[in-house]
Amino acid sequence: MLNLDWFQPYDGVIHSTGVIYAAICNLPRDMRFKRENMLVLGLLPGPNEVSLHQINHYLAPIVNELVLLWDGVTFDNTFEKICGHISALSSCYRCEKKANYENHKYNFAGMDNMSEWFINRNSAQFCENALGWRRCNSNAARNRFVKTTGVRWSELLRLPYFDPIQFLSIDPMHCLFLGIAKWIVKRIWVDENILKPETLKEIQKKMNQFQVPADIGRIPGKVECGEGFANFTADQWRIFFNIYATVSLWKHLPGVDKKILTRFVRICSILVGRIVQSNLMDEAHQKLVEIVKIIEQNYGRDMITLNLHLSLHLYECAKDFGPLYAFWCFSFERMNGMLGKMLTSKNILFLLKLILNSIPLFIF
Ligand SMILES: [Zn+2]
């Protein structure tokens, strides 16, 4: 949303100064007009208000940038990992845990010596290494440096308050629901034939008997489709474990998997709450540790994925950023959906009209 506003900065003399503002409509309505969220795109010095097409001289550089954004901006490969970390698949970016490379893939097994690696990485050391990366003067030198230190430079490190370890939160949506929930059900229970195709039909039948309030969300209806639990979204995994899983899965699971199920359901019910208590967060953390140990002991080291490891950091992220709903990615996913729907000619015209209407000079 753009707006051109004129005001008189001086007393006793007529001198009009203009400002072109932008508000980010992606922000909630109660946030987008806060001072810290408003953008000043241009200043028009005056002393007189510009008229008609003269405004174009001021709009041109702004439009150049908007056009660039509309086309999309590709960052240099260096910034694919925006905070300068190497892929988390080979090394956790919050603690000292390094992935094991076994059977041609990485795993994060090895809970026995947790006290040795469950230690926060050192931010100061990271920043020092990042500066070292900047001093490398060739691609080969930079590659060698990354292999040794696991660190690259990121422009974000120019922010004086930025902590490259603490400020990287784990997204609970990807970690818990698209990561662990999906992994446990599909890769362990379905692939290991604990939940067979005919069992999936029974589970679906049981779920269809549930009568839940309308605002809880759609009942997942694809349990028996495809390879099982087909195309479940993160939200459907959340709903499944919070409402349906215990009743519909209980009689189909052996003892050890019942242990995984009860712990994960409890974890989900604690972590999705709007209010979290530190003692309950502590319980959730302990249960996550137990789940990782149970899976490692019963299904092997290969089954300990990055997400299972990262879930061990959710507790400390919640301490820094608040309840999980306050920093999970569901909100961004909703924006993706909205933006996708806007890409129709009708909506683009609507957006253009909205922008033009917010610039008084364009209303002839
Ligand atoms: Zn870690």
Q: Model-flagged regions — what are they?
A:
Residues 25-73, 103, 272:
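Compact, glycine/acidic-enriched structural inserts
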Residues 5, 62, 83, 92-95, ...:
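Short, conserved catalytic/metal-binding motifs centered on acidic residues
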Residues 13-18, 34-36, 53-56, 80-82, ...:
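Short coil/turn segments at secondary-structure boundaries
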Residues 8-12, 29-32, 48-52, 77-78, ...:
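Eukaryotic short linear interaction motifs
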Residues 1-48, 94-97, 247-249, 269:
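Acidic, metal-ligating active-site segments
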Residues 49, 67-234, 253, 341, ...:
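Domain-level detector for long, ordered catalytic/regulatory cores in large eukaryotic signaling
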Residues 95-98, 186-364:
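Terminal interaction-prone segments of large eukaryotic proteins
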Residues 1-31, 57, 61-64, 231-239, ...:
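Core catalytic machinery and nucleic-acid-binding channels of phosphodiester-processing enzymes
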